Amino acid sequence: MILLPMVANAYDIGVKNEDGVFIYYNYINDGSELEVTYYDLDYNIYKYKGSVVIPEEVTYMNRTRKVTSIGEMAFYYCTGLTSVTIPNSVTSIGKRAFYRCKGLTSVTIPNSVTSIEKFAFMDCSSLTSVTIGNGVTSIGGCAFSDCSSLTSVTIPNSVTSIGDLAFSGCSGLTSVTIPNSVTSIGRCAFYGWKITVVISLIENPYAICGKADEYDRTFNLNTFDDAILYVPAGTIDKYKTTEGWKDFAHIEEGEPTGISVVRNAEGDKAVIYDLNGVRLSEPKRGINIINGKKYVKK
């Protein structure tokens, strides 16, 4: 008798979408709904690639079911995936769902999604734009860690918790907006080297990991020392006495004008940057940031 190797399938059904792309699903919730999954147990025989449009519902064997979840490792290491459309029927994005999808440049997470699990978009190194829907309540640990092309993040006011290392290693990240709804910020959540503006809309600040927490700092030392922390009007004294937040060298009330700036402690000496936050030895033609204020040189 000759034994032939067999592939163990990790899916319940595979159905072509309208673009002719096979998408694989598992039955969930007693078979009433579908979850997007991968093809095989080794995650490597079939790879999603190009543009993938996930449908809101799938009809199979004369029965129609909603697609409500993107399962754990569904698009794991699909480096050829360039775009994905997530429908409004999806409520959760599982662990490592898009881990190391290095060709993915942007993603829109619809308002129907309530949770983004751990490592969901970790190391998507080409990801420059993320739109997080207003239904998301939790962003898991390392969810966007090492997304090195991501430059800014606005977290919607539906989010209550941001996990450990959620945006750590995002070396291109220059600005972060944290809504008042957030009640928990994990260790090293925004540990990125280039953050120049932090906008906190939290009206009653609570302790976060500060400069003394060597391995757990919510932000790195450069951010604490050089970035500007913008806080709601009337709250600056609270921030200056709250653990972690008080470590910011530059705290101002109100919001910036939409420009990313950097300020450091050099007394009255002029500190000059261009609009991209690059430090200049002298003003150049056009708009310059000098000691945190915009000036025009003709």
Residue positions per predicted region:
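C-terminal tail/sorting-segment detector
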Residues: 287-298
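Short beta-strand/loop segment at the start of cytosolic alpha/beta domains
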Residues: 11-44
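Residue-level detector of functionally pivotal "anchor" positions at catalytic/ligand-binding pockets or at interdomain
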Residues: 254-276
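A recurrent domain-boundary module in secreted/ectodomain proteins
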Residues: 241-258
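Structural signature of tandem-repeat unit edges
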Residues: 29-34, 46-69, 79-92, 102-115, ...
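Consensus positions within tandem repeat domains that build extended binding/scaffold surfaces
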Residues: 72-74, 94-99, 117-122, 140-145, ...
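Bacterial Sec-dependent N-terminal signal peptides
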Residues: 1-12
